[in-house]
Amino acid sequence: MDTALTTEQHEIRRALRDLLARYGGPGAIPAAVGTAEGYDPALWRRLAGGLGLPGLALAEEYGGAGCTAAELALACEETGRALLPSPLLATAALAAPLIAALGTPDQRAALLPRIADGTLTAALRPPRRLARHRPRPHRRQPR
């Protein structure tokens, strides 16, 4: 198995590191997690619009880049390296592949293009019957 990065993967890493060095960093973390969203929405728009991160591993028919999970894992690794609070992992690595694999055609058509362009974030929730406690809606309050 060849574990060397491709030229495209090196470019993804470089572009993401450059962007995070400019707009992220340890000083930006408290402000980002203090928002109602729990992340910096302006930086998320840059990651989505400029780099296409949420749609990196989504099929082109849904507005994604059509890359593999390896490129998405690389993006998640870089955002983790920068300690970036963002919806990338939950949205692009967890929810989007499940919607792509298990969603109805209507669900895929309605949700995946919005995930790919960054206008929709998503997360997973266990079915209520599997939860050990009574889940209730929670909206994060700004600090």
Please provide the spans of the model-predicted regions:
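Short beta-strands and strand-loop turn motifs
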Residues: G55-L58, L89-A92, A123-R125
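Short alpha-helical functional segments enriched in proximate histidine and acidic residues
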Residues: L19-Y23, L98, A122-A123
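A general structural signal for well-ordered alpha-helical segments in protein cores
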Residues: W44, L72, A92-A95, R108
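N-terminal glycine-rich flavin-associated loop
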Residues: S86-P105
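Non-transmembrane alpha-helical segments in soluble domains
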Residues: R17, I99-A100, L112
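Glycine-rich, Trp-frequent "lid" loop and neighboring beta-strands that shape
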Residues: A65, P105-R143
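Amphipathic, small/basic residue-rich leader segments at the start of a protein or domain
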Residues: M1-P85
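Conserved catalytic core of Hanks-type protein kinase domains
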Residues: L47, E78, A101, R114-I115
